[in-house]
Amino acid sequence: MKFSESWLREWVKPAINSEELAHQITMAGLEVDEVAPVAGEFTGVKVGKVVECGQHPDADKLQVTKIDIGEEALLDIVCGASNCRLGLTVAVATVGAVLPGNFKIKKAKLRGVPSHGMLCSFSELGIDVESDGILELPEGTALGMDVRELLELNDVAIDVDLTANRADCFSIRGLAREVGVLNRADVTEPVIDAVAPSIDDTVSVEIKATDACPRYLGRVVKNINVKAESPIWMQEKLRRCGIRSIDAVVDITNYVMLEQGQPMHAFDLSKIDGGIVVRLAEQGEKLTLLDGNETELNSNTLVISDHTKALAIAGIFGGKDSGVTTETTDVLLEAAFFAPDHIRGRARAYGLHTDSSLRFERGVDSTLQAAAMERATQLLVEICGGEVAPVNGSESEADLPKANVVALRRTKLDSLLGHEIPSEDVVEILTRLGCNVSVVDDSETTDAGWTATSPAWRFDIAIEQDLIEEVGRIYGYDNIPNQAPVAALKMNDHKEANQPLKRVRDLLVDRGYHEAITYSFVEPEQQKLVVPGVEPLILPFPISADMSAMRLGLIQGLLNTVVHNQKRQQSRVRLFESGLRFIPEASAENGMRQEMMLAGVIAGTRGEEHWDIDTNTVDFFDLKGDLEAILELTANEKAYSFKALSSENKKQNPVLHPGQSAVIVVDAGLETEKEVGVIGTVHPELERKFGLNGRTIVFEIEWAAINTRVLPEAVAVSKFPANRRDIAVVVDEAAASGDIVKACIAAGGEFLTDAKLFDVYVGKGVEEGKKSLAIALSLQSVERTLEDADISGAVDSIVAVLAERFGASLRD
């Protein structure tokens, strides 16, 4: 909405300047896009009259004039404008005047004829008006008057970007109301007296779509002079609001729309057949619009018609066949209320966008129509003359908008604004906004506050938050003190020993893995291949038949993902996933035990393809090394061990190759161990059924078994030398080397700091069915240098324990 500040100040006079006014409007929620002067900077331009006008002796397109500016001497001025003529009242830039662009007027000679000034056009005064010649001022204007003062050009045009909810501000009336509220200033509306009818002519009005048009008013005005020129003050006000002057009738309806906020239309009465009918269009009905384009109407479009044809698209655009022309003498003025829901989107459907549709789409005050009709009639008679008939029309009171009654609680107001505004200020603000306010005094409950009945022009006040917004913006957001919210915060319980899952994810990504996320819903028959003998939870309403069971583990989803990637020529696959498995258990909550699991899978080549590196296929120990890296994050990796699957375990884990798989166990204390996961190569039979291409190794481990870590402790660094002793022991080939290393650590005593397996040998020199394990023993004291007796004692103790538990003997 673009408006003239001087026009606004005719209605309300805030004691602030233009810059402060623009800032105030913006802070109230009506964002100002631009504040621009309505004319350029100029001085020395006066009102003059052409008293002589003749042809230039040496130029066909120039005229020599004498101009009266109310002084003793007439001014000789040469002019080239086509509309320069005898008796014309003009804007004269006298010698010494300065026009926009610092253009100074001096005495000159044009083709030998002296010229003491210049007759100015709109553009030469920096006024944005399309015109072909010089500015024509109203006849009878006082000669010698400053043109800047005459046209009130010490003014600015303020362009406001209105949000969709503030349709009430699409008029000077609405903006004045808003500025008056913000400044506690009175609003002076123009006096609109009812125009007394002088004739009895009326046109019947029938509304067939009362829900779309609850009110329609019409008035006949006869014998008007449609060629009368709009007064300069009206043209200027329209121009400063961004509307071009067309003719007196159109200018008047546009003026009333800008002033009052009520779009209007004028029909040529002689082109109306019978009476006015407000109805929905017939599908395919055609109408030629004022711009000359013929459009085919949709059945959901509201039209104004007579008894034979459509005359206009209601609230959007008029029809050419019923429009006012230079031959028109009798008109029918229209002022109606159209429901926003029946106008919204219709203009866009026809590729139209008009000032009228913009206002009706967002909502027009349903009480304005009668006053707007009288205002338009008043102006039409003043400018064009004519004989006025009484206003007639039709309305459906039941379909007119009803005022909203909204409750505002004191507690809610304070809570949302974060500041307590005095109650008397709240009542004053709502009253100034046009609301009918009642106090609700209920101090014993949280309902104490007010009820407010919204005014007819505010469609957007419907709920409590709307009232709070109004109170806040009128009170002034700048007046609400900055106060940080106070919240009693309690830090989450955090144990430093907790192992974050993100740390494990990052480690696996750093080792070349990609994280996968598979569905928790799986194909039940396929799951039986991986976890036989356990009945999963079957979904009553699955997404599809192959996603009807809750998963019992993560391996099934990862294997399917490997197959998916291998089918897309991925020769190296490394994936991991963390997620829940769902184990039916009667004693658990809802009969279901949910456990967080971590699983991984590798397949294909060990490394990326490279000309200098052999592309070996992955094996069991590649994945075991990655899993050991995860266990090291706990800083307690010695508590974990890998044990070959027993025949019993093989039955429980048919997914794994019987000779290339192990269970993951953790020391549970009191010399007991707990199985927490599995690792191994996928069984060839299962590999075939899944469609895997080549060797695939998987692991799955309970997250609860690795989600804590041993916190580091400061220990003294020994300044005494460390000693290493290597022993080679012969044991049964079936003996687990991990168990033997753990036994060494347990039996080594206080001086043993580490024991590592560094060689395994089977062959010549070792009895069949036996193997030789070479173990490095590290010994050190923090108090003294160890003597041979100390070292020998520890080694002998270890050898004795190995002999007792595993039948081990030192290799010769």
Curated annotation (Swiss-Prot):
- Domain tRNA-binding residue range list: 39-148
Q: Which intervals of the chain form a coiled coil?
A: none
Reaction catalysed by this enzyme: tRNA(Phe) + L-phenylalanine + ATP = L-phenylalanyl-tRNA(Phe) + AMP + diphosphate + H(+)
> Ranges for the B5 domain?
401-482
The record's SUPFAM superfamilies line, in alphabetical order, gives: Anticodon-binding domain of PheRS (SSF54991), Class II aaRS and biotin synthetases (SSF55681), Nucleic acid-binding proteins (SSF50249), PheT/TilS domain (SSF56037), Putative DNA-binding domain (SSF46955)
What EC number(s) are associated with this protein in UniProt? 6.1.1.20
- One of its Pfam families is tRNA_synthFbeta
GO CC annotations on file = phenylalanine-tRNA ligase complex
**Principal place where this protein is found?**
cytoplasm
Query: Where along this sequence does the record place binding of Mg(2+)?
Result: D460, D466, E469, E470
Q: Which Gene3D superfamilies match?
A: 3.30.56.10, Bira Bifunctional Protein, Domain 2, Ferrodoxin-fold anticodon-binding domain, Nucleic acid-binding proteins, Phenylalanyl-trna Synthetase, Chain B, domain 3
What is the required cofactor set for this protein?
A: Mg(2+)
Q: How is the cofactor bound?
A: Binds 2 magnesium ions per tetramer.
Q: Molecular function terms in GO for this entry?
A: ATP binding; magnesium ion binding; phenylalanine-tRNA ligase activity; tRNA binding
Q: Which positions fall inside the FDX-ACB domain?
A: 718-811
Biological process annotations from GO? phenylalanyl-tRNA aminoacylation
* InterPro entries in alphabetical order: aa-tRNA-synth_II/BPL/LPL, B3/B4_tRNA-bd, DNA-bd_dom_put_sf, Fdx_antiC-bd, Fdx_antiC-bd_sf, NA-bd_OB-fold, Phe-tRNA-ligase_IIc_bsu, Phe-tRNA-ligase_IIc_bsu_bact
Q: Which UniProt keywords apply?
A: Aminoacyl-tRNA synthetase, ATP-binding, Cytoplasm, Ligase, Magnesium, Metal-binding, Nucleotide-binding, Protein biosynthesis, RNA-binding, tRNA-binding
Q: Which residues are connected by disulfide bridges in this protein? A: none
Q: Give the matching HAMAP family.
A: Phe_tRNA_synth_beta1
Please state which protein family the record places this protein in. Belongs to the phenylalanyl-tRNA synthetase beta subunit family. Type 1 subfamily.
Q: Spell out the subunit comment.
A: Tetramer of two alpha and two beta subunits.
Protein's recorded name? Phenylalanine--tRNA ligase beta subunit
Please tell me the species this chain comes from.
Photobacterium profundum (strain SS9)
- What is this organism's lineage? Bacteria, Pseudomonadati, Pseudomonadota, Gammaproteobacteria, Vibrionales
Gene that encodes it: pheT
